């Protein structure tokens, strides 16, 4: 697949261009510099050509992240066949722009100088100065207004090799990592991909943006989404936006990794667990930093996990250490297993055999001596598996009984680990407002 990197100093519109080209809002965009710290990937289709775009952090930012961001950008360059060098010519060329240009020359990749924020022809005189960078004719665009993007991509295509033979497209499993800041999400992502795609530090909230990273495991394609940590009280506008992004990442995922610190589970984790459960997506609780738990405290830590995450007790757990690569492959193997179950369908005859045996063996709820009777069961949806149960009185079904029944369905029908939904439909001799008699 073709790869193209987008580079430039902070706040010249790299992420706006990235979002415009891939057709959705992936990177955090704001009016202050240094918003994108990590290199993130997105897929675009241009005239039937599949292109992976890599959006890099702002180079020569002059802050504590400068060296780490440059290293991520260099990683992005390794597989890129062309580079889109984004500048804001209205501000004039800065020393940082010239440093980026010198750095690009040393890398030896084809470079397309891209003058962003050229919203009309009256701004085009600003382009003259860009010739001095030595990369040829600049392309004028406005990412915000989608101006000049075809000209830009036509120039990019000149540097890309001919496509190989078509390869059958395997639908990827999209997995989001959610968790509070500094719980180890980015370290886990780096351990899985065997790279340093996400910046890792000891500061909360290091990853502000969501990173989409494609990866293969066991013949299966994955898209790993590393979200910004959700905080209870955001202290800046960007953290507030990161909360929304984390929630949105859950919705566009197939499987959710809820990453928790083995020794510190609080209200943040409960909130995230509720969000994950409500989404109907399979949840895997990733207990990170397990290697830091003393042997004498393993049982008590496990008990604490059971108590605090009891409402998603059906969710499987994987115990990991990103530093030691412990449990890393189990995360992906479990995700593949749950994804398959999540989309499974069970035949109606099998369901009703199970329902008949269940009612013979188990006590059912009753109201004033009148029992709940379940006549028929069928699966009406997948992802998550959703079952309609036809009964005499839906109002006899308590929340506790429904939860009990969901657990038994998971246990008996090979749906362990996935959320199950039930829809109750009234049918038969008992109707609300009628006599409760046989």
Swiss-Prot record:
Positions annotated to bind GTP 1: 8-15, 55-59, 116-119
Record-listed GTP 2 binding positions: 179-186, 226-230, 288-291
A single MF term (Gene Ontology): ribosome binding
Entry annotated with the keyword Cytoplasm: no
Transmembrane segments annotated in the record for this chain: none
Signal peptide: none
Pfam families xref list: KH_dom-like (PF14714), MMR_HSR1 (PF01926)
Alphabetic keyword roster: GTP-binding, Nucleotide-binding, Repeat, Ribosome biogenesis
PANTHER family, alphabetized: GTPASE DER
Oligomer status and interactors: Associates with the 50S ribosomal subunit.
Protein name: GTPase Der
Taxon lineage: Bacteria, Thermotogati, Deinococcota, Deinococci, Deinococcales
């Amino acid at each position: 697949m073709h790869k193209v990197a987008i580079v430039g100093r902070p706040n010249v519109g790299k992420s706006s261009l990235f979002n415009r080209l891939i057709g959705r809002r992936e990177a955090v965009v704001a009016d202050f510099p240094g918003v994108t710290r990590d290199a993130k990937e997105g897929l675009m289709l241009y005239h039937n050509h599949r292109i992976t775009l890599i959006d890099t952090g702002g180079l020569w930012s002059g802050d504590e992240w400068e060296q780490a961001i440059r290293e991520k950008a260099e990683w992005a360059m390794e597989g890129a066949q062309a580079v889109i060098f984004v500048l804001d010519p209205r501000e004039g060329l800065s020393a940082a722009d010239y440093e980026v240009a010198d750095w690009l020359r040393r890398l030896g990749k084809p470079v397309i100088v891209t003058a962003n924020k050229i919203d009309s022809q009256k701004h085009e005189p600003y382009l003259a100065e860009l010739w001095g960078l030595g990369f040829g004719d600049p392309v004028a665009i406005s990412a915000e207004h989608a101006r000049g993007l075809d000209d830009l991509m036509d120039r990019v295509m000149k540097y890309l090799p001919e496509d190989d033979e078509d390869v059958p497209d395997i639908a990827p499993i999209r997995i989001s990592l959610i968790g509070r800041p500094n719980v180890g999400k980015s370290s886990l992502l780096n351990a899985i991909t065997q790279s340093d795609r996400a910046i890792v530090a000891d500061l909360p909230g290091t990853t502000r943006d969501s990173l989409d990273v494609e990866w293969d495991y066991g013949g299966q394609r994955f898209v790993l989404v590393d979200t910004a940590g959700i905080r209870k009280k955001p202290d800046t506008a960007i953290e507030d936006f990161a909360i929304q992004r984390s929630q949105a990442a859950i919705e566009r995922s197939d499987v959710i990794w809820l990453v928790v610190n083995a020794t510190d589970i609080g209200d943040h984790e409960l909130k995230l667990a509720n969000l994950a459960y409500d989404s109907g997506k399979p949840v895997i609780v990733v207990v990170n930093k397990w290697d830091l738990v003393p042997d004498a405290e393993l049982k008590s830590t496990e008990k604490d996990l059971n108590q605090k995450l009891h409402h998603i007790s059906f969710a499987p757990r994987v115990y990991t250490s990103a530093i030691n690569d412990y449990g890393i492959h189990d995360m992906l193997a479990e995700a593949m297993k749950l994804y398959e179950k999540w989309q499974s369908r069970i035949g109606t005859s099998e369901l009703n055999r199970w329902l008949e045996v269940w009612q013979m063996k188990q006590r059912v709820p009753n109201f004033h001596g009148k029992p709940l009777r379940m006549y028929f069961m069928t699966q009406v949806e997948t992802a998550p598996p959703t079952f309609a149960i036809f009964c005499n009185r839906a109002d006899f079904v308590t929340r506790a009984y429904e939860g009990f029944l969901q657990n038994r369905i998971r246990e008996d029908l090979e749906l362990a680990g996935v959320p199950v939904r039930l829809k109750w439909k009234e049918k038969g001799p008992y109707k609300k407002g009628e006599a409760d008699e046989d």
